[in-house]
Amino acid sequence: MESFLPLVDENLRSALWFRPEMALTFGTLVLFVLDLVFRRSQARVALLTAGALAVLAAAAGLLAIQPPDAQALFNGMLANDAFAIFFKWLFLAAGALTVIIAAQGRDFPPERIGQFFALLMAIVLGMFMMASATDLLMVYLSLELVSMVSYVLAGFRKGDRKATEGSLKYVIYGGVASGVMLFGMSYLYGLTGTTSLHELGAQLQALQAGSAVSVAATRVALVVAIVFVTAGIGYKVAAVPWHMWCPDVYEGAPTPFTAFLSVGPKAAGFALAIRIFHSALAGPSSPVTGFAESLAGIPWPAVVGVIAAVTMTLGNLTALGQTNLKRLLAYSSIAHAGYTLMGLSAVSDRGMQSVMIYMLVYLVMNVGAFLVVILVAESTGSESILDYRGLSKRHPSAAVAFAIFLFSLTGLPPFAGFVGKWYLFYAVFERIDGPGGAWYAWLALIGALNTAIALYYYVRVIRAMFIDAPYVAEAPPVRLRVGYQVMLGAFSVAILVFGIWWTPMVRWTEASLQLFRG
């Protein structure tokens, strides 16, 4: 009994700092109940939207009073630190924007909007725990929570063949990736005897410092474990070669959820990758970066760099031939995962900060781009690039906003996307004078060439909007709801402001580099 009491005390203490997650859990259940109670109410959409935003606001309010010091929760299963809090704010913003967009659009019938909001809260909860996970068990459980609910929402359109096909592919690829990652985790546990990410790092260092025989005996198992865990994370961020689910899911899913999927789970995947690669898979550290340069004889930063180069190249080259804008943005999202992996491959504080800055900027410009896709699709009933011809004449403000988003996605100044991409390249440039500098120089060159490729297919859309004549003689006008107009204006202003004045982003991310180290 006496040995049990400290566990109870620890859980009660942890619960005080687990309140944002508790608010999301309770809110998810309440939204399901409200959906049943107000099933026949004329104001059900407004009530459920207010309920979903209230849940997110409650979580935000509780998150705002979190302590700044890093600490372990629930006996080391989770960590409460500035790094996790940064990503949680990002997830709340993505969730709130998705709720507002979905409430105004036509993708969800009124009788099903409550289910969507409740399931969306569940995904946000899972992403919260992904950002805080410091134990392999919690890593897997949080990843599965996000994945399982995402499968449902990807196929949320009843009777839609593309939605069903995309959801099925998502389930198949997700199930395989989940099993592969779990298999890799089992190897890590077998090698070290622990599931704690921080203890894993210490145990792996001890293994590598052992005799030549013991190191050789464990090297193969360790390599398999690293490859399999990397595959699980690569699936979540849509990196090559684990990206094949992405285009079909993005095209078939309701567009508000596609916008959320392109940012939220991707950011959660990168948060998880940073925790794992800078905690669990940390071998003997470099005096330059303070992080591991190799593990089991493999220079894993270079491996991540290769994945980054292949991901951005394949994503951009495939996007060149797309005629459906959602599929184009899907391949663009794959390419942006490659750019972000550049920061991860730098294995430095600057690299981590560049990932955080880029995810923050990517949230605004990508959700903004999908918002334009929604409003054009509602007017034309199509997502083809042909329907964007002459958009500048049918709705000039929408065309200008979309051009801003696309130029920002390219990474051109003076837009916020340039700042995000600059920090990614800066993190790589810092490594050129150190070990493996030649490889980092090549990675920077590949990234620059891919930016030029991306400019081509983004400009193709811009040309259609401002230069090409409408595809049909009587092109339907594009009508914007007031809410959409406000959001497009806010996104455009944010991209322009942070493209010129990025100091707040840099300071926030610098203050958020405090990871719980065990």
UniProtKB/Swiss-Prot annotation:
Segments crossing the lipid bilayer: 18-38, 45-65, 82-102, 113-133, 136-156, 171-191, 220-240, 254-274, 295-315, 328-348, 355-375, 399-419, 439-459, 486-506
Membrane topology label: Multi-pass membrane protein
GO molecular function annotation: NADH dehydrogenase (ubiquinone) activity; NADH:ubiquinone reductase (non-electrogenic) activity; quinone binding
EC number(s) per entry: 7.1.1.-
Catalytic activity: a quinone + NADH + 5 H(+)(in) = a quinol + NAD(+) + 4 H(+)(out)
Localization of this protein: Cell inner membrane
Gene Ontology CC: plasma membrane
Principal subcellular localisation of the protein: membrane
Pfam families linked to this entry: Proton_antipo_M (PF00361)
Family matches, as InterPro entries: NADH-Q_OxRdtase_suN/2, ND/Mrp_TM
Disulphide bond pairs: none
Keywords: Cell inner membrane, Cell membrane, Membrane, NAD, Quinone, Translocase, Transmembrane, Transmembrane helix, Transport, Ubiquinone
EC supergroup of this enzyme: translocase
Any GO BP annotation: ATP synthesis coupled electron transport
PANTHER family named among the record's database cross-references: NADH DEHYDROGENASE (PTHR22773)
Family: Belongs to the complex I subunit 2 family.
Protein name: NADH-quinone oxidoreductase subunit N
Gene name as annotated: nuoN
